[in-house]
């Protein structure tokens, strides 16, 4: 009886100490840790190690969930579901190497080029997810979202907060980079960002056309050359092909699906 009362007293004290030291995960699991120590007759050092390990595990889990929430990932991003039979330009070996993230550690860039519906965004999102799991800060955003952030960061607290986050990132995926023409002032903003990222942060860029064709509309050879030089420096270019996944799996409101899409 005395032993049980002492255990309860020690548990309450440990919970109070843990909360005072801002160790919420330890405070939450003190009872489990004490029970395990008693059952296994752990040494003092083993008990202390268990206490610290529980706190570290909780913090790492919280950090992971925060990174995942802020990453901007779409609903589907699991590369284990990637359809190699449908896609052209990405095989199992190549994707496995990309998932190992060695290129991120080396600050290499990745350019995914191909028609709409060939898996560019899915691959980019999947690699961002792999980086998040590995403990990196990684984000996925469209070029339009990125440019809006860069243009408004001086007048918008939300934009400045987003800007500060992406400046700390190890990986930034820019989706739909060539969807719209780029204005000269936008190209300059993008150049400054990419220049700051060089040899520090990896970029993934998804594009439905070659970057050279996209930047032809700038009519400014100096800006075009500088931006291309930064974007393609230490860059692996992967060209994706095949039929559009969205067209093959499009949904209809009718019971008998008609494949005629009016083209």
Curated annotation (Swiss-Prot):
SUPFAM superfamilies membership: P-loop containing nucleoside triphosphate hydrolases
Keyword tags: ATP-binding, Nucleotide-binding, Transposable element
A GO MF term: ATP hydrolysis activity
Binding site for ATP: 114-121
Top-level lineage group: Bacteria
GO biological process: DNA replication
SMART domains from the UniProt entry: AAA
Family stated for the protein in its record: Belongs to the IS21/IS1162 putative ATP-binding protein family.
NCBIfam families the UniProt entry points to: IS21_help_AAA
Protein name stated in the entry: Insertion sequence IS21-like putative ATP-binding protein
Organism whose genome encodes this protein: Bacteroides fragilis
Organism phylogeny: Bacteria, Pseudomonadati, Bacteroidota, Bacteroidia, Bacteroidales
Gene: tnpB
């Amino acid at each position: 009886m005395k032993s049980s009362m002492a255990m309860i007293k020690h548990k309450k004290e440990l919970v109070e100490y843990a909360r005072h030291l801002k160790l919420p995960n330890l405070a939450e699991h003190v009872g489990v840790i004490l029970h395990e120590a008693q059952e296994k007759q752990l040494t003092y050092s083993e008990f202390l190690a268990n206490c610290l390990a529980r706190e570290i595990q909780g913090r790492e889990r919280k950090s992971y969930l925060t990174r995942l929430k802020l990453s901007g990932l779409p609903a589907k991003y699991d590369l284990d579901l990637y359809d190699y039979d449908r896609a052209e330009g990405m095989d199992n070996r190549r994707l496995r190497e990309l998932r190992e993230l060695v290129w991120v550690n080396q600050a290499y860039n990745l350019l995914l080029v191909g028609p709409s519906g060939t898996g560019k965004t899915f691959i980019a999102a999947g690699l961002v997810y792999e980086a998040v799991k590995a403990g990196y800060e990684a984000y996925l955003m469209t070029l339009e979202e990125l440019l809006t952030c860069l243009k408004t960061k001086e007048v918008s607290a939300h934009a400045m907060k987003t800007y500060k986050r992406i400046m700390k990132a190890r990986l930034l995926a820019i989706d739909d980079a060539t969807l719209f023409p780029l204005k000269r002032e936008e190209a300059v903003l993008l150049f400054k960002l990419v220049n700051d990222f060089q040899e520090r942060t990896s970029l993934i860029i998804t594009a439905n056309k070659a970057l050279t064709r996209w930047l032809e509309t700038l009519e400014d050879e100096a800006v075009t050359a500088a931006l291309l030089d930064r974007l393609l420096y230490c860059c692996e270019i992967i060209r994706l092909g095949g039929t559009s996944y969205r067209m093959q799996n499009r949904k209809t409101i009718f019971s008998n699906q008609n494949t005629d899409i009016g083209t």
